Amino acid sequence: MTSILVLHGPNLNLLGTRQPEVYGTTTLEMVNSACIAHGQSRGLSVACLQSNHEGALVDAIHAAKGVHRGIVLNAGAYTHTSIALRDAISSVELPVVEVHLSNIHAREAFRHVSHIAPVALGQICGFGAQGYLLALDALAAHLSPEGAR
């Protein structure tokens, strides 16, 4: 079974209670459960990990090589600041789909810049928790023989 890592960055452990008007009321546990179930329905094994620490996220990306075939990444605020995450993604040569619950392009100007997007397969934002499932679908299609490039 194809294995995918779903990686959540800083403050995503507070989903459901942190700014629900922006991020919704779905908790991280609910997101993870939905990702695992959705992945199974697509023939994917899904592992989920959250950290508030940039180095731990870099370590998780490095450790994914040889274990997982792709990564769904919501880097949170590190999207806009972390060259380390960008370099980690480039170094493992795995397809990454960047996810954001809110539409980062419709928010504050500093959120319009993503250091992840240039090294990602694609970006999904503004669809709430559904964005994670869309990202899993995108990776499944990309990794299928028909989606190979």
From Swiss-Prot:
Biological or metabolic pathway of the protein: Metabolic intermediate biosynthesis; chorismate biosynthesis; chorismate from D-erythrose 4-phosphate and phosphoenolpyruvate: step 3/7
Keywords: Amino-acid biosynthesis, Aromatic amino acid biosynthesis, Lyase
GO molecular function (one): 3-dehydroquinate dehydratase activity
InterPro entries reported for this sequence: DHquinase_II, DHquinase_II_CS, DHquinase_II_sf
UniProt-annotated site: Transition state stabilizer, residues: R18
Enzyme active site: Y23 (proton acceptor), H100 (proton donor)
EC number: 4.2.1.10
Protein's GO biological process: amino acid biosynthetic process; aromatic amino acid family biosynthetic process; chorismate biosynthetic process; quinate catabolic process
Reactions performed catalytically: 3-dehydroquinate = 3-dehydroshikimate + H2O
Pfam family, one: DHquinase_II
Annotated residues for binding of substrate: N74, H80, D87, L101, S102, R111
Disulfide bonds, paired cysteine numbers: none
Assembly with partners or alone: Homododecamer.
Function: Catalyzes a trans-dehydration via an enolate intermediate.
PANTHER family per the UniProt record, alphabetical: CATABOLIC 3-DEHYDROQUINASE
Family note: Belongs to the type-II 3-dehydroquinase family.
Protein name: 3-dehydroquinate dehydratase
Organism: Ruegeria pomeroyi (strain ATCC 700808 / DSM 15171 / DSS-3)
